[in-house]
């Protein structure tokens, strides 16, 4: 997927929701693994690199999109950027204390192979963390899945199940930790305010990259119909989403 096309607006998501639960979980892993050298694979615009850099000696970010990497500002002397693929991981063996992926594993072509390669890069006692969306949502609803045809099917095709992720970690020789929910995302929009919501804009998320223009427009049309139907009753349509981000962790023994 061409993330360079949305790099200019990508960080808007963190202004809306800074994902403090994810930050807390990552800081906890840094502490638990006594990590000094970190690698984020699929680092995008470097949000988590900049968040964790003050706590460690070195943070390396790898991403395949040069457009996203060019958005990383104020690197400082603790952050290193590498334009490359999760399919190769061009780093020395046993060179990191913590490797983490936030909302990116579903983009990797060889997900199991990535986990195997990551295990080789970990120092003894180090950890691999995969954080991502629970698809389909275990609780509540998703406006995107409810209104946009093909969105749920597309995400199901690219997000591996959490049991699968855990089995890949175990097969790679990692000691699998209990799966944790690290973030609850809840929001509610009333009436026409939903049409201005960042996350339903055409470039608001990668899920829409998997939809045709006609599928995307069909979703917008459905939302408009729901708004109009509520207004005809003298009411205001209510759009709710409640999602979870989970974290799978494997420790190098």
Per-segment meaning from a language model:
Residues 1-34, 47-51, 68-71, 127-157:
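Conserved class I S-adenosyl-L-methionine
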Residues 45, 176-253:
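Conserved Class I S-adenosyl-L-methionine
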Residues 103-104:
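Short catalytic micro-motifs in class I SAM-dependent methyltransferases
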